[in-house]
């Protein structure tokens, strides 16, 4: 598992091929954000909270770890979905880049694997784990995700 800073420092070593990534969070970080952790997968003392896929792992990890939260990204909705959700829970807005960076540095780590079958692998991971921050194909944490979706929309409006 790697920290946000490690990913940014090693970004050129990450291949531009498909794969699946998994974001883990400390119990303290989840508590701070109000993220439910019941029955989540635990690895190295961290809780698995989000799984994603990409056809270009370098680009996707750079996006999640270093997105600039530009007004144009906020307006168009192209801000990293993970960062949207973290920002919503931290500040009620989408323009708090520093807050998200600091939170990720203190409370989150990511691991990834390359795969030609990344779509199938991601679906398998979502179905096999309880993931509070995943929306698509996720039957778990319905109430939390519904409330987060409402708050996320308001956070975007608060940032424009």
Question: What annotation goes with each model-predicted range?
Answer:
Residues 1-160:
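Boundary/linker segments flanking structured domains
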């Amino acid at each position: 598992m790697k920290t946000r800073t490690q990913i940014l420092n090693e970004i050129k070593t990450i291949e531009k091929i498909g794969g699946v990534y998994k974001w883990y969070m400390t119990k303290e970080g989840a508590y701070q954000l109000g993220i439910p952790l019941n029955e989540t997968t635990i690895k190295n003392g961290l809780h698995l909270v989000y799984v994603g896929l990409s056809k270009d792992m370098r680009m996707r990890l750079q996006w999640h770890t270093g997105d600039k939260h530009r007004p144009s990204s906020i307006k168009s909705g192209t801000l990293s979905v993970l960062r949207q959700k973290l920002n919503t829970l931290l500040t009620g807005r989408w323009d708090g880049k520093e807050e998200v960076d600091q939170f990720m540095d203190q409370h989150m780590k990511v691991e990834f694997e390359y795969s030609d079958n990344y779509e199938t692998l991601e679906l398998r991971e979502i179905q096999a784990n309880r993931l509070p921050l995943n929306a698509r194909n996720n039957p778990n944490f319905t109430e939390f995700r519904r409330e987060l979706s409402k708050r996320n929309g308001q956070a975007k409006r608060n940032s424009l």
